Amino acid sequence: MESPIQIFRGDPGPTCSPSACLLPNSSSWFPNWAESDSNGSVGSEDQQLESAHISPAIPVIITAVYSVVFVVGLVGNSLVMFVIIRYTKMKTATNIYIFNLALADALVTTTMPFQSAVYLMNSWPFGDVLCKIVISIDYYNMFTSIFTLTMMSVDRYIAVCHPVKALDFRTPLKAKIINICIWLLASSVGISAIVLGGTKVREDVDVIECSLQFPDDEYSWWDLFMKICVFVFAFVIPVLIIIVCYTLMILRLKSVRLLSGSREKDRNLRRITKLVLVVVAVFIICWTPIHIFILVEALGSTSHSTAALSSYYFCIALGYTNSSLNPVLYAFLDENFKRCFRDFCFPIKMRMERQSTNRVRNTVQDPASMRDVGGMNKPV
């Protein structure tokens, strides 16, 4: 979900000594406490000193968090994509959207090592091309994640509130087409990030920053414009659509005891709806804090206290952490994903369990069963 935070992380601060690290100077849409003004001059000396008292332990802690996010997120999301590709029964409309979300999260986790290095070195040592790529991946991840979650919510709304229309709309093919459209739409921002992104040497402090490069004479205007656009189109509007969809779904679920002609199918429908709701809720919880910081900064009410700067760092880390949480949620909340994960990790054990189950079913037929031979719930 989900995540221009990386641009912030790719931007070094004015100084970083063993005793204190300044907040990185950012040309992204994130708050900038020690940022250069429209003329390119660094903030006042008193302001810099005021914002400089950040414990050197903070970059180390955040680097440790990013290391966990990198391993869990990359492995977990790769496993999710493999499972959806490998197992035919997993190719449902909902899972096609989950594949898209996993792809975006897996891509952004690949930037974690670079972001960690910047936190520790307080400079961008990887060159201009890689800077453009990292910034672009950040914006792609942010927009594709929230757009995909929005479409998943709309998909659930149609499945719950308009089951007849769902037969035509909710197909794997149409879900794939929508995913392609999401990436094309996100490209309007991602390609712009490639064009505008780049490195800049700050000779006054002898560091290299990786950020969006706006014209110096119009820097403040473009910076504010970028923050407002991201806040509105990548957070406010999608979240409002999601809230409307789930409000209508809750009203529908409360008013009807049985959504379909089968109790088992109805259970699966509610189960998948709950899964999507949890994934969306976790995304909003992880990303709301940093968006609040953005809103506060845009209103000009920033603080240079140690607590504020430390909170800012960890809100960014929280946003990135979301990229590693979804595979864990699938494993705990969805029986089909859990079964496929176990089948991949423990193939011999799962094969023996299936053989045992098949022998029992051959002996005692259960006409009410809604599970296939592999033990998977039928897709809804």
Curated annotation (Swiss-Prot):
Subcellular location: Cell membrane
Function, in words: G-protein coupled opioid receptor that functions as a receptor for endogenous alpha-neoendorphins and dynorphins, but has low affinity for beta-endorphins. Also functions as a receptor for various synthetic opioids and for the psychoactive diterpene salvinorin A. Ligand binding causes a conformation change that triggers signaling via guanine nucleotide-binding proteins (G proteins) and modulates the activity of down-stream effectors, such as adenylate cyclase. Signaling leads to the inhibition of adenylate cyclase activity.
Residue ranges, Cytoplasmic side: 86-95, 155-173, 248-274, 334-380
Domain of life: Eukaryota
PROSITE patterns membership: G_PROTEIN_RECEP_F1_1, G_PROTEIN_RECEP_F1_2
Changes seen on gene knockout: Mice are born at the expected Mendelian rate and show no obvious phenotype. Mutant mice do not display analgesia after treatment with the synthetic agonist U-50,488H. Unlike wild-type mice, they do not show reduced locomotion and increased salivation in response to the synthetic agonist U-50,488H.
Membrane topology: Multi-pass membrane protein
Protein name (Swiss-Prot/TrEMBL): Kappa-type opioid receptor
A Pfam family matched in the record: 7tm_1
Tissue specificity: Detected in brain (at protein level). Brain (neocortex, hippocampus, amygdala, medial habenula, hypothalamus, locus ceruleus, and parabrachial nucleus).
GO CC, any one term: perikaryon
